[in-house]
């Protein structure tokens, strides 16, 4: 029997593990052979859960952030973390790493990038940085304090994580255009939250971008994810109460 992941195999800011139980309930409300389109694929967790719960469905995962590349490099990431763990032996757990040990760790990461051409900096960040900090390069990491938070166990290879799922990599508006006329299509809408951290997303988000997303919802079935830290629902409520207010600028 296929394993269903309750959280993404690799770290990702904004993955929907806390919503999984409620999301599973919602999936049962749609008819057989429904087409689900995950417009903001992120870690792919929503697409994965959808395909596991609804194997009859067509599931489209928009992997705009190229999470697949991170998954494909899990074996190399595990080796790198194992080497970093060895370098940090004797360093107190969760304490700051400085001096020669810090330099050796950066040298090992640099060698990985030179020899293999790729380092999963988001996953490495989860083992070396605190407070949900993530970097995208060694240059950025060298500016940060690093800590001995290195994961003790290897990451699962997750080879079946995206099994049976159609994968695309486009701007969400292009994906929407491709599927908007499919009968009964359901859009899974999980944009980076307004007023929250969007650092691991490749696109830059402005207020206008969030409002553009709302045009996708009109006239279609959708599951929309938000947060009590986001202001988007408050904004929509204000717009509903003030429909005739034009721009004062």
PLM feature segments, named:
Residues 1-35, 45:
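S-adenosyl-L-methionine
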Residues 37-50, 61-65, 126-131, 181-198:
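Conserved proline-anchored active-site loop of SAM-dependent methyltransferases
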Residues 46-52, 70-73, 179, 196-202, ...:
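A short acidic (Asp/Glu
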Residues 52-58:
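Conserved S-adenosyl-L-methionine
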Residues 58-162:
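Class I S-adenosyl-L-methionine-dependent methyltransferase module
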Residues 58-60, 185-187, 219-226:
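Hydrophobic beta-strand segments of well-ordered beta-sheets in folded domains
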Residues 164, 168-210:
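Active-site segment flanking the S-adenosylmethionine/decSAM binding pocket
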Residues 207-249:
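Long, positively charged, glycine-interspersed low-complexity recognition regions
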